[in-house]
Amino acid sequence: MIIFIVFVVLFFLCKDSLLKMMYPKMYKEIVSIYEEKYQVEENLIFAVIKAESNFDAKAVSNRNAIGLMQLMEETAKDVARKNNIELNSDNVRQELEDVYRNIEIGTCYLATLLKRYDSKEVALAAYNAGIGTVDGWIEKGIIKNDGSDIENIPYKETNNYVRKILRDYKIYEVLYP
């Protein structure tokens, strides 16, 4: 019983440190640069990175999304072209493995989605499922542009993705106000 009480006391004394280990702010200097440049909340960027790659800069998904923010090569090329971001189109994969480039393009893309849609929820759905898919859902009345009915997102993966990022975003907000 004493061991349990000691464990509980230690947990409460160290919980912020433990939570910050689970929800780190790795690459903070880089995120800060692009958070300011593209006007995207820092804690939202960290929540996306955590969900997408868990801060593994070399992560590659089964769909070939690359790096910290799990960008598809075609999406990265499109975002770079539309926003005058220099990108070596002959070696996009290598470019996306660079943490600076990945965070810049991912944050720029997130900023574009946040401007396009009326809510974080819908922007995050588009980050995961794609703009065309989300626009189709809105046109068909499946979801609203204001994000008030995210439970109606028809793709289970995207529905869970949006909820996970929103949860992680709130945790980041509490840990790093």
Regions found by a protein language model. Name each.
Residues 1-14:
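Hydrophobic membrane-insertion alpha-helices, especially the h-region
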